[in-house]
Structures are given as C-alpha cells and as structure tokens.
Regions:
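Residues on the lipid-exposed face of transmembrane beta-strands in outer-membrane beta-barrel proteins
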Residues: 1, 15-19, 54-58, 117-121, ...
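Transmembrane beta-barrel strands of outer-membrane/channel proteins
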Residues: 1-5, 15, 31-35, 67-73, ...
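Extracellular loop and loop/strand-boundary signature of outer-membrane beta-barrel proteins
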Residues: 2-3, 37-42, 51, 100-105, ...
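Residues that define the transmembrane beta-barrel architecture of outer-membrane proteins
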Residues: 4, 9-13, 46-50, 111-113, ...
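Transmembrane beta-barrel wall of Gram-negative outer-membrane proteins
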Residues: 7-81, 105-125
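Short loop/turn motifs that connect adjacent beta-strands in outer-membrane beta-barrel proteins
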Residues: 22-27, 62, 124-126, 181-189, ...
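Structural signature of Gram-negative outer-membrane beta-barrels, strongest in the C-terminal barrel
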Residues: 57, 167, 186-198, 243-310
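Surface-exposed loop/turn segments flanking beta-strands in extracellular/periplasmic regions
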Residues: 84-99, 150-156, 203-241, 288-293
Length: 310
C-alpha cells in the first residue's frame, strides 16, 4: 500500500497485492489499484486517475498461460492543451508554466478496458508452440478550449470543440519456435503469424466563430462557455458516432539464428511479409471513402551478426 502527494493538492493511493498458490506455486494472482486526484501545479488544472488491473497465471511443467485484465479512467478539468497559431506568422513567447490558458469548463474523460492472454506449450524439449490474444476498448469524450492566437500580446479567441471518440482493437499471434543442430551449426528457428484489427468511431461539433469570446494566453481571466445551440461545424452523429475508419494488419515471419564456434559467432536471417488494409468512411452517412483507403503488402528482410569473444 502506498500514498503519494504531488503539486498543490494532488493526493493518490496505490495497492499492489499478489501471491502464488498450489503445491508447486504453479498458480499466481496479482491485483493493482491506483486512485489519484487533485489540482496540479497549474491553477485550475484538476486531474483524476483510477486504475484497476488483475493478473492471473499458471506455470506447469510444459504448459504456461497468463491472463491480464485492466480498467483505467483519466479525467481532466481545465487542463492546458495547445495554442492555435494558424492565424499568425510568428512563434509566440510561451506562457509561464504556472499560468493556465485553458478554461475551467473544458474537460476530457478517457476510459480504457483491456485484456491480454498468452499461452505456451512445450511440444518437446526443443520445440515450443505459443499463442496470444489481446483486446482494448477506448472511449474519449470531452469539451476542449484551445485558444487561437491573434497577436504578439497574447490576445486570442476561445473556441469550443466537443468530441466523442470510440476505438476498439483486437490483436492476436501464434507460432512455433525451436532449436536443432546441423553438424557443427546450431539453429534457433521461429515461425509465426500476427494480425490486428482496429475500428474507429468519431464525431465532433464546434462553436460558431462569431460566438467565440476573447482571452489572453498570458493573463487568462476565464470566459463563458460558447452556447451549444449555435454550432457552425460538425462531423458525424455526436450521440452515436458512425465508423470513421478501419485498419487491418497481418504478417508472417520466419527467422533462423545460426551459431558456430560454440555460439560465439551468431548470424540471424529472417523475413516478414506484412499486409496493411485501411478503410475510411464518411462520418455522417457511413459510406466508404475510396480516397481514404489503402491496401498494400511488402516483404521485409532481417539480418544481423553477433560475435561474443568472451
């Protein structure tokens, strides 16, 4: 158990507990908890983090497996993001690091749930089969207030950007690795396959330029949040975002590390075939945008030499 204190008033606590079970300690379990919140060294910048993760594993004579599950939520209120300098032709003097040019009403909530599973099985003393699977769900929703700089004095307009983003990813791998000898040459071989798919959903809406209040990035006094009833730009269905992009990758790999002179001299040769497929979709209609798509593959060689004199 731990307790920490950071900056002005950010207090946190942690818990890390684990143990092994069974006649030969073949079963294991571990739990991690983190909660931290409060104001940072920047005025009106409040942050909160919550994390829970659990790990389970089994280690037998020729079979090993593990499962990790986790949840994380990070919340930001009034946290500085960035300064938009697209309307000027100079790089401004940065504000002091104890000045907050963001607004109190700006916030961001980011949630992640994830899981990872991996297993290995020793077919013989020299050969092992392995596999793994992972998945993640992420959700970000927030109201952002990035100031748009107008002059060297630091005057800027404050826009309101509402964002709703959802991301889901699944990845997996499988393969076999082993070692054998051919005469005086040793071999360490690995053959594997991996794949990943990712689905993105995003929608946003932005306040009308005429409604954007003015502020100063060096002397921010705070402004009222622009009215949501008069947005002049939007992308997608905010309450239920449609798919905006999909990505799929897959790859085959083969490698062999050859050793001579009692493995003091090692030479590795390998190759990987990687394929990437990307699709983009209209955020409002859901129709596929051919211009945003990509479909390609390539062979990638790998080689290396290691000499160990001692």
């Amino acid at each position: 158990v731990g307790v920490d204190y950071t900056s002005d008033s950010q207090i946190g606590t942690t818990l890390d507990a684990g143990r092994r079970f069974g006649d030969n300690d073949q079963f294991g379990a571990r739990v991690n908890l983190v909660h931290r919140e409060g104001e940072t060294g920047v005025p009106n910048d409040r942050r909160r983090t919550t994390l829970l993760s659990t790990g389970l594993d089994y280690k037998g004579d020729n079979f090993r497996t593990s499962l990790d599950l986790g949840y994380q939520k990070k919340t930001f209120h009034g946290s500085p993001t960035s300064v938009n300098i697209s309307a000027v032709d100079f790089v401004p003097e940065p504000p002091k690091n104890d000045r907050n040019f963001s607004q109190k009403w700006a916030y961001s909530d980011i949630e992640n749930e994830f899981g990872m599973w991996r297993s290995e099985y020793d077919i013989t003393d020299s050969w092992t089969a392995y596999t793994g699977l992972g998945a993640q769900h992420a959700h970000e929703e927030g109201i952002y207030s990035a100031p748009k700089l107008l002059d060297k004095s630091g005057n800027a307009t404050v826009s309101r950007l509402d964002t709703n983003r959802i991301s889901d990813s699944v990845s997996g791998m499988a393969g076999i690795r082993g070692n054998f000898d051919t005469g005086f040459v040793s071999h360490k071989v690995n053959v594997g396959y991996s794949a990943m798919t990712k689905n993105e959903k995003i929608a946003w809406k932005m306040s009308a330029t005429a409604d954007n209040p003015t502020t100063n990035i060096y002397h921010n006094t705070g402004v009222a949040m622009p009215d949501s009833s008069n947005f002049n730009g939007s992308g997608g269905k905010y309450s239920d975002p449609l798919t905006s992009g999909r990505t799929r990758t897959q790859g085959w790999l083969l490698s062999d590390t050859l050793g001579v002179l009692d493995d003091k001299l090692l030479f590795t040769a390998g190759a990987r075939h990687q394929k990437v497929v990307i699709r983009g979709y209209n955020k409002i209609t859901g129709a596929e945008n051919d211009a945003d798509g990509f479909d390609g593959s390539r062979w990638m060689p790998t080689y290396g030499v290691v000499y160990k004199p001692w």
